[in-house]
Amino acid sequence: MIGRTPEYIVAVRPLKDGVISDNDMTEAMIREFIHMVNGGAMMKPRIVLCVPSSVTDVERRAVVEAAMSAGARKVFLIEEPIAALIGAGVDISKPNGTMVVDIGGGTADVAIVSFNGIVQSRSIKMAGNKFDQAIIRHITQKYKILIGEKTAEKAKMEIANVFDPTGEKKMTIRGRNLLKGLPESIEISDQDIYDAIHENAMEIVEQVKLVLESTPPELVGDILSNGCLLYTSPS
């Protein structure tokens, strides 16, 4: 709905940068999710919610309170890196170290997980939404074409390359020519997306380096052998 609503409808993001930005809307959203699952039954469910690994105690309490107000009987919180590994089918109960880079809409979490817990982690408010805004700015500055968030996200998902762009991967996007005020279609390449988000992506890479530097040698050896799980979700 972002960018497509009439003036009398305001589309909001209940969550921003991984934490609650609008308590009322967050509560309403969770209440709707509960209704979708239990079909309006009177029984209050138990809920598991994911939070970034770096959230404060105050932010955790805000999430729990919103869910309880929405109709939850009990609320369990789980860090997003652990949820990503479980969702990928990784057995986190083993003593082997597993690295995960979870890039969401508001935050990117980097973590080393072993024995059902996080050994080392870092979280940064640099993720999908910031990438989208960087693409919008770049296209505006270079082509004088204003595009929407959904167009930027689509370009990111389809042709982004943050390490070795060739300029051969291309797609057509539509926006408004800021000089003429008229709709216009242009062709962009992976080089455009690289120029827009490379610097932001390197901030996440830096977090990966910092986590590895503070990880015990035995677990680093596991990561060297097993690699890293990269998990991304839509903005």
Question: Residue spans of the language-model regions?
Answer:
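Conserved Rossmann-like nucleotide-cofactor binding loop
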Residues: 106
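Conserved small/polar residues in nucleotide/adenosyl-binding loops
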Residues: 231-235
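Nucleotide/phosphate-binding catalytic cleft detector across ATP-hydrolyzing
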Residues: 1-103, 111-228
